[in-house]
Amino acid sequence: MAMTLRDIINKLLRRQPASASTARERLQLVLAHDRSDLSTELLDQMRKEILEVVAKYVEIDVDEGAVSLETEDRMTALVANLPIKRTMTGQIQLKEPKNQSEVDSPETEGKDQNS
């Protein structure tokens, strides 16, 4: 079956957005890394520690997960996409933030906070 000129043009034009999209994603990753001013070693250490902390609470698929820097509208974000296999069965007590516990402490209860 012979390809028409239209088929050839359509085939060529379909590939262009895919490669342009890939190039754009790569450029955004490079820009995010540069703007964050984080070394590769520090970023790798952060990824490792984030995975360790999350793994304390849920079972995650480390091989399928990703922690990356993303830039959108001049804002850089650290994004963790971690598929959860299952949650842990034990109950976990979370600590209150230090400032919140001071506000709710028995010594300050019933007192006017402006005095």
Swiss-Prot record:
GO terms for biological process: cell division; regulation of division septum assembly. Residues 89-115 are annotated as: Disordered. The keyword tRNA-binding does not apply. Coiled coil: none annotated. Keywords: Cell cycle, Cell division. It comes from the Bacteria. NCBIfam families: minE, PRK00296.1. Prevents the cell division inhibition by proteins MinC and MinD at internal division sites while permitting inhibition at polar sites. This ensures cell division at the proper site by restricting the formation of a division septum at the midpoint of the long axis of the cell. Belongs to the MinE family. This is Cell division topological specificity factor. It comes from Prochlorococcus marinus (strain NATL2A).
